[in-house]
Amino acid sequence: MKTTLIASLIFSLGSFSAFADGTITVYRDHAQPLKVSGAKHLADLVSQPQLAGSWWLGAVISERQASVEAQAKHQVLLSRLASLAAEEGGEDGAAINRVRQQLQAMKVTGRQRVILDPDRVRVRAKNNPPLEGDYELWVGQQPSTITLAGLVSSPGKKIFTPGKPVIDYLDEVSRLSGAERSYAWLIQPTGRVEKVPVAYWNKRHVEPMPGSILYVGFADHTFTSAYDGLNEQIISSLTHRIPD
């Protein structure tokens, strides 16, 4: 019966049932966290009235063990950047340290690559996986900013302007020593990553969504392997970042 199904999913500020299929802690716009129990499938979570009107494009759901792994990888990255900065010294070392400080200030989680939009979850069975174990969900309202990160003179939040392309955001900052100047990486709030051409000879009109991260990475280094895979590591941490 419908009443039985509804009763199986309980929102509370207290403890949750030990018999729950999935237990989820929900963080909403810096409000007190909610505890959800008894969610058998993703649709049981995202269709709750308490979450109506949420901006699902920027929502992040994570699983406990995946979070442990993501946090461990993030610490490895921070250590690598610290070592590389010490080895390089000078302007390059200072620039690397600025990137490390940005990453050190953020928290990462074991983001699950699933669709969270309630309509899409309900319509297709493959979008409605079972929930088993412990999860965390971050969801809120659409932000009015994007974030610049990486080898830029002024990292952090910038006002989002509809129709404004990536190249225009980058024109408002300087790039630090060792920065890639032909491409930048756009990380949309959905977690999708796009390598965007931004030099005068290859630039393309690409508009970020609100809540996006625009990352200016390290240029390729022909004569050393010290930077191999570094941008990929940083982008991985940025895609697993807990929303502000």
Can you describe what each PLM-predicted range is?
Residues K2, F19-D244:
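Ser/Thr/Pro/Gly-biased, low-complexity, turn-/loop-rich segments
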Residues S15-S17:
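N-terminal signal peptide c-region/cleavage motif recognized by signal peptidases
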